[in-house]
Amino acid sequence: GIDMEAKFAKHMIYITNNDTPGLVGKIGHCLGSQGVNIANFNLGRDKIGGNVIELIEVDSPVDDSVLDKLTQIEDIVQVKKLNF
């Protein structure tokens, strides 16, 4: 398993990916270019170069088109929106 501390918020994005340099920046750039503001970013990984989970709190609901763009980024395995 992957250890992580995170507070759940109203609007979140759940991402799993391979641990590769620059991927967090690509995620941030993708979200920013779509007008999505990151409120909080939580990351956990099992080992260097291994599996990663991100829980990203955003200010507003995310359109499915944004999720589609995230899934096109190399090394991203899974993307889901979470609304509480």
Label for each model-derived stretch:
Residues 1-84:
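A conserved regulatory-domain signal marking ACT and ACT-like small-molecule sensing domains
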